[in-house]
Swiss-Prot record:
It is found in: Secreted; Host nucleus; Host cytoplasm. Keywords: Host cytoplasm, Host nucleus, Secreted, Signal, Virulence. The lineage of its organism: Eukaryota, Sar, Stramenopiles, Oomycota, Peronosporales. Secreted effector that completely suppresses the host cell death induced by cell death-inducing proteins. Its main location: secreted. GO terms for cellular component: extracellular region; host cell cytoplasm; host cell nucleus. The RxLR-dEER motif acts to carry the protein into the host cell cytoplasm through binding to cell surface phosphatidylinositol-3-phosphate. A motif (RxLR-dEER) lies at residues 35-55. This is Secreted RxLR effector protein 94. Belongs to the RxLR effector family.
Amino acid sequence: MAQLHRWDFWCFSTKPLGYLDVVQAIEAEVYDAWRQLRQSANPSKAWHQWKSETRKLFQDLDKKLRGQQEAVVHVAHATFTVAEMQYRQCGGEASHIVF
């Protein structure tokens, strides 16, 4: 049985656009890239270089944000587990009101 080859493409996540600093950095970067393209002797090469560098930057940013989100979820899960254990160890209905 032949296995189909699967191509995985990275898609730009719109989550970083929720941060004003990121949007302003993108705007400044685009303006600089536009200026460089206008002055370049070989705009196609400059464009592909800028595109690959920008893609790498966005991939790294996306990876960092996902890592931070996973860390927050892990801490919240641990906190919830501790609260759940304390709830089960408490005796009586009056003690359960605290939780």
